[in-house]
Regions:
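A short helix-breaking turn/cap at a secondary-structure junction
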Residues: 1-78, 123, 263-284
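Short, well-ordered beta-strand elements within core beta-sheets of diverse protein domains
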Residues: 6-13, 143-145, 242-243
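Short, well-ordered beta-strand elements
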Residues: 10, 236-245, 252-253
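Short, surface-exposed loop/helix-turn segments at secondary-structure junctions
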Residues: 35, 103, 186-211
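Short helix-loop capping/hinge segments that flank enzyme active sites or metal/cofactor-binding pockets
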Residues: 45-60, 108-167, 179-184, 188-190, ...
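General small-molecule cofactor/ligand-binding pocket signal
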Residues: 88-95
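Small-aliphatic-rich amphipathic alpha-helix that forms the alpha element of a beta-alpha
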Residues: 167-168, 204-227
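Short, Asp-centered acidic motifs that coordinate Mg2+ and/or phosphate
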Residues: 174-175
Length: 284
């Protein structure tokens, strides 16, 4: 979906499980217009050997939104851990202007959403009504649901050009390291965005000021992962986000396995309760 920008994987407790599921699901869907190259070996095998020393680009901010001190400490601590494992970390800036990037992305999302809803209406025999949609979907359709074919094509070409820029950037780097979020994980309900009075630029501001890093790799097609290596003062995990070159998922998984061994996270549980035997019990 979204001209190739929407791809699914999983959230797992271990790198082993992530690699195993990728082994089970990897491969090109017949006739798909976009596909990553097939790996030479299984992803589970990639975990058996430490990665070669990697050139890691440390990116602390993208776009106009500041990164909080906690997020900066989380990513810098991850960088120090990588250096201790033999990798070389250097500061870098990504070749993207984020407001322009997001405008193109939402042009594609708006046109795609309009198309999906029209198809759904045809399948069920009645048009989809605005009241059946969430407010944020209505906001996107209001601003981007009637773009022209030329505007849609231009947005896709813009995203393709961005992918080429990122490929050039990756000639000098093996991996990009950034925060996953600009601040501590948001309280439940904060990102609800169910307010029809919001303009699209306000919706984008509210969400992408919180998470500006990850969408870039949906667009470039690069494999990426969030690894829990730091906990906030409130005991919440703050991810370090890593991205590799297009098709180099095995490099990321090997790095993740190395990080997991050096700084395990599976034993970390919520300070309030933990699920034991299907029931909730106090954590110890």
């Amino acid at each position: 979906g979204w001209a190739g920008m929407s791809t699914h994987h999983c959230i797992t407790l271990s790198v082993r499980d992530s690699a195993g599921l990728l082994d089970a699901t990897a491969g090109m869907e017949l006739g798909a217009p976009y596909a990553a190259p097939m790996a030479a070996h299984s992803y589970a095998q990639a975990l058996q050997q430490a990665p070669r020393p990697l050139r890691i680009a440390l990116v602390e901010q993208v776009g106009p939104w500041p990164t909080s001190s906690q997020s900066l400490e989380a990513v810098r601590q991850a960088a120090r851990l990588c250096e201790s494992l033999g990798h070389r970390v250097t500061s870098a800036q990504l070749p993207v202007v984020l407001p322009a990037f997001l405008d193109q992305v939402f042009t594609i999302i708006g046109a795609s959403t309009r198309n999906y809803l029209d198809l759904l209406g045809q399948l069920r025999g009645t048009p989809v009504q605005p009241g059946e949609l969430e407010a944020r979907t209505r906001i996107i359709l209001r601003d981007k649901g009637a773009v022209s074919g030329a505007q849609y094509a231009a947005a896709v070409e813009w995203i393709h050009a961005f992918g080429r820029q990122m490929a050039l950037f990756m000639r000098d780097h093996d991996v990009i390291l950034s925060p996953t979020l600009t601040r501590e994980p948001a309280p439940i309900g904060e990102l609800d965005l169910q307010d029809d009075s919001l303009r699209l630029d306000e919706l984008i501001e509210r969400f992408h000021s919180y998470s500006p890093f990850t969408a870039l790799f949906n667009a470039s097609g690069q494999p990426a992962m969030s690894v829990p290596l730091y906990w906030s003062a409130n005991g919440l995990p703050m991810g370090a986000h890593f991205a590799a070159r297009f098709g180099e998922d095995a490099t990321l998984l090997a790095l993740a396995a190395q990080l997991e061994q050096a700084q395990p996270w599976r034993q970390r549980v919520a300070p309030v309760n933990a699920c034991v035997g299907g029931a909730f019990a106090p954590a110890t």
